[in-house]
């Protein structure tokens, strides 16, 4: 019986699941948005949101806890220097899941998971070269 067992197994063993969510959390922190299945996105939210809450209070102990969970110094730096300050006034709900159809091949429901209030990068203006008329 599976009484009081929370979280999805996702057809993986525990070490594979832990490594997968560590990599996905690092990618989401670095890029701001990633595309994955809906089930993985919902589980990733459970992994990442406590890390961002931890990053709101910058201390050596919190940085070590974050590093123990991510194993990436660059991600810890982004968490504490950028995301902690960005979400200082927000009491939770740092991620948004947007469904985006189904994957070709196995029709798995796909979704984008993104950080809310992320800065919008404007596209560079396209340079149109004028052809020389002779």
From Swiss-Prot:
Keyword Transmembrane helix: no
Domain of life: Bacteria
Pfam families for the chain: Ribosomal_L17 (PF01196)
This protein's UniProt keywords: Ribonucleoprotein, Ribosomal protein
A biological process term (GO) from this entry: translation
PROSITE patterns reported for this sequence: RIBOSOMAL_L17 (PS01167)
Keyword Ribosomal protein attributed: yes
Residue pairs linked by disulfide bridges in the UniProt entry: none
Molecular function in Gene Ontology: structural constituent of ribosome
InterPro entries in alphabetical order: Ribosomal_bL17 (IPR000456), Ribosomal_bL17_CS (IPR047859), Ribosomal_bL17_sf (IPR036373)
Example of a GO cellular component annotation carried by this entry: cytosolic large ribosomal subunit
Family according to the record: Belongs to the bacterial ribosomal protein bL17 family.
Known partners and oligomeric status: Part of the 50S ribosomal subunit. Contacts protein L32.
Protein name: Large ribosomal subunit protein bL17
Source taxonomy: Bacteria, Pseudomonadati, Pseudomonadota, Gammaproteobacteria, Alteromonadales
């Amino acid at each position: 019986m599976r009484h009081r067992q929370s979280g999805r197994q996702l057809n993986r063993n525990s070490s594979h699941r832990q490594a997968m969510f560590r990599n996905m959390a690092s990618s989401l922190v670095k890029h701001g948005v990633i595309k994955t299945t809906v089930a993985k996105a919902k589980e990733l939210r459970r992994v990442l949101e406590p890390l961002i809450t931890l990053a709101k209070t910058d201390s050596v102990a919190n940085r070590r806890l974050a590093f123990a969970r991510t194993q990436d110094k660059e991600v810890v730096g982004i968490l504490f220097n950028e995301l902690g300050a960005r979400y200082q006034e927000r009491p939770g709900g740092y991620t948004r899941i947007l469904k985006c159809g189904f994957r070709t091949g196995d029709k798995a429901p796909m979704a984008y998971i993104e950080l809310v209030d992320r800065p919008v990068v404007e596209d560079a203006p396209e340079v149109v070269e004028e052809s020389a008329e002779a």
